[in-house]
């Protein structure tokens, strides 16, 4: 009989709609990050660094890039005969076939997968957070408290607490109150969406709540267990943790990597972040190029000037270009004499010559002000921007655009271009 002390279930099926055009063709956990990685690399690396060798990755929205990236788990040493990594999409059953309708529903639909390992504990993770955590220490804490559930939590500014599940604890860190995104939070200790369940407690709750519409851990499972007097503890985490679910937080997390002393260090030998790497040549920096305080990916060619930016692999930045405070993802091409300021350029984008991105004053986005609201220019995958155009702040572009899409050669601040077939 196969028996694992703890297995991990990694929720990676989310669309990430608050990232706008960045996730129109790819799931949020598969979005590129830090010039080399994808967001899902961080929880996967945490698992293997914590000694967890059995991970189920639950996918749904736009799964192809994610499936290809994970493969059989070789970069994370998760290509195992017993355990390893398994990609778990919704699958057709003999009856009641359905998509995953909530975080807990997704786990419920994979009870059989978990059962085969006879785990003592199950670790529930989100695939869209940037952080380093030793889950073994959290498990030791769970055991020491004889807990049924342990929730990783961290202090946040009180004004931001209403965005999270909030916990109130006693002097022993036992949770006495739990509220999911309360309007008037009683505490600033926020759930990180990382849970350790004793297996029997998790299984019982999922079965009892199987008919709950859009069953979710924060909204349903935790309150159910709390109301049934389960021992629920908060594991307080004080390291770096970033939910990169908005354009501003995604941009900030990338920019934090290039600080002189980064608060999130990718270069630590004792806690490596693993990823799938392609066989590509080294970067090339031309004689007249200039780079200051930036990350430059493998295979990238720089002929222009780059300041305070994160550049992925296989990017070409032509002569006369000036890139500032921006993220340019893999395999994008920036034409000659183009200026890019505070922008996020997704993968495989082509930008013409003499283009200016991020000019003028900020204006509220005309269509999606809650998404495009941090002064950024956001360009989706496979987009094309023609020569000689100017693009203002709080804008979004997706698709193969032509000069006709830019009246007077300009997309003013707050504007948006989404071509047919892109959303």
From Swiss-Prot:
The protein, known as: Glucose-1-phosphate adenylyltransferase
GO MF term set: ATP binding; glucose-1-phosphate adenylyltransferase activity
Annotated EC: 2.7.7.27
Subunit structure, interactors included: Homotetramer.
Gene3D superfamilies: Hexapeptide repeat proteins, Spore Coat Polysaccharide Biosynthesis Protein SpsA, Chain A
Major enzyme class: transferase
UniProt entry keywords in alphabetical sequence: ATP-binding, Carbohydrate metabolism, Glycogen biosynthesis, Glycogen metabolism, Nucleotide-binding, Nucleotidyltransferase, Transferase
Family: Belongs to the bacterial/plant glucose-1-phosphate adenylyltransferase family.
Binding positions (alpha-D-glucose 1-phosphate): 100, 165, 180-181, 191
One GO biological process term: glycogen biosynthetic process
Source organism (scientific name): Lachnospira eligens (strain ATCC 27750 / DSM 3376 / VPI C15-48 / C15-B4)
InterPro entries from the UniProt entry: ADP-Glc_PPase, ADP_Glu_pyroP_CS, GlgC_bac, GlmU/GlgC-like_hexapep, NTP_transferase_dom, Nucleotide-diphossugar_trans, Trimer_LpxA-like_sf
Function comment: Involved in the biosynthesis of ADP-glucose, a building block required for the elongation reactions to produce glycogen. Catalyzes the reaction between ATP and alpha-D-glucose 1-phosphate (G1P) to produce pyrophosphate and ADP-Glc.
The gene coding this protein: glgC
NCBIfam families in the cross-refs: glgC, PRK05293.1
Coiled coil segments of this chain: none
Top-level taxon of origin: Bacteria
Associated pathway: Glycan biosynthesis; glycogen biosynthesis
Record field: catalytic activity: alpha-D-glucose 1-phosphate + ATP + H(+) = ADP-alpha-D-glucose + diphosphate
């Amino acid at each position: 009989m196969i028996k694992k002390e703890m297995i991990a279930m990694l929720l990676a099926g989310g669309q990430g709609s608050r990232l706008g055009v960045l996730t129109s063709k790819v799931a949020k956990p598969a979005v590129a990050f830090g010039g080399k990685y994808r967001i899902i690399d961080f929880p996967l690396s945490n698992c293997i660094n914590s000694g967890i060798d059995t991970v189920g990755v639950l996918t749904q929205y736009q799964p192809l890039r994610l499936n290809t990236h994970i493969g059989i788990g070789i970069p994370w040493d998760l290509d195992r005969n017993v355990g390893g990594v398994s990609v778990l999409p919704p699958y057709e059953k003999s009856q009641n076939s359905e998509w995953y309708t909530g975080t807990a529903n997704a786990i419920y639909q994979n009870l059989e997968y978990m059962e085969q390992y006879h785990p003592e504990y199950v670790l529930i993770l989100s695939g869209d957070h940037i952080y380093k955590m030793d889950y073994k220490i959290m498990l030791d804490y769970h055991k020491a408290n004889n807990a049924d559930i342990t929730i990783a939590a961290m202090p946040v500014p009180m004004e931001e607490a209403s965005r999270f599940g909030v916990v109130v604890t006693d002097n022993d860190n036992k949770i006495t109150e739990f509220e999911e995104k309360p309007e008037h939070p009683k505490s600033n200790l926020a759930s990180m969406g990382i849970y350790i369940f004793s297996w029997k407690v998790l299984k019982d709750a999922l079965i009892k709540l199987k008919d709950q519409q859009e069953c979710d851990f924060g909204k349903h499972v935790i309150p159910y267990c709390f109301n049934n007097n389960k021992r629920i503890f908060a594991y307080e985490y004080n390291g770096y943790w970033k939910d990169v679910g908005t354009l501003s937080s995604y941009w900030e997390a990338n920019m934090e990597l290039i600080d002189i002393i980064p608060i999130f260090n990718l270069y630590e030998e004792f806690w490596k972040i693993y990823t799938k790497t392609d066989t590509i040549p080294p970067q090339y920096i031309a004689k007249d190029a200039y780079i200051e305080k930036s990350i430059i990916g493998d295979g990238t060619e720089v002929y222009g000037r780059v300041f305070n930016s994160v550049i992925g692999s296989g990017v070409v930045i032509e002569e006369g270009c000036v890139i500032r405070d921006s993220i340019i993802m893999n395999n994008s091409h920036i034409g000659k004499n183009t200026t890019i300021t505070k922008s996020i350029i997704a993968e495989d984008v082509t930008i013409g010559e003499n283009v200016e991105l991020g000019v003028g004053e900020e204006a509220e986005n005309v269509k999606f002000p809650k998404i495009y609201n941090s002064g950024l220019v956001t360009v989706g995958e496979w987009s094309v921007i023609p020569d000689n155009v100017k693009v203002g702040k709080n804008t979004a572009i997706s698709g193969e655009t032509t000069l006709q899409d830019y009246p007077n050669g300009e997309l003013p601040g707050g504007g948006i271009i989404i071509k047919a077939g892109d959303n």
